[in-house]
Amino acid sequence: MRAIADTGLIVAFGNRTDCFHPWAVDIAKSITEPLLTCEAVLAEAAFHLRSVPYVLSLIEDGMLRIAFEMAKHQQRLAQLAQRYQDRHPDLADLCLIRLSEIFPHHTVITVDEENFRIYRRNNRETIPILCPPRSPARH
């Protein structure tokens, strides 16, 4: 599966008490190539997990690959921020929308189904997403 990793997947994978941990482990077992992501997602995940070394180890171990240079996409990120200002997207979400535009054959793996069902790549295209089955509220 060619995919892009959002923060929630990384946090769930790294936190055994997260309600989505089993789902995240199943995803990790099924991947055959590194999941693409961006620095904004990694910063969020490191914050939530309280472990920069752990998040960096996912890159070193080949589970994740940084595939985005924000400086090259500032104009598009600003357009996306303006378009979705009513949803108050964080920088990571904007970067993932842009990653989905750059890598159109990749699926975004996220626990944020509500927002990613609304976000569009290339202004009109639905972003393919993979979310956990609907389950209890996150811890």
Task: Describe the residue ranges of each PLM region.
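Short active-site oxyanion
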Residues: 30-35, 63-65, 102-107
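Short, well-structured N-terminal submotif of metal-dependent ribonuclease cores
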Residues: 1-37, 48-57, 122-123, 130-138
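Acidic, PIN/NYN-like endoribonuclease modules and their adjacent C-terminal/linker elements
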Residues: 104-139
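Active-site neighborhoods of divalent-metal-dependent phosphate/nucleic-acid chemistry enzymes
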Residues: 67-113
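Amphipathic alpha-helical interface surfaces
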Residues: 20-24, 41, 51-55, 73-77, ...
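Helix-adjacent hinge/juxtasegments
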Residues: 54-72
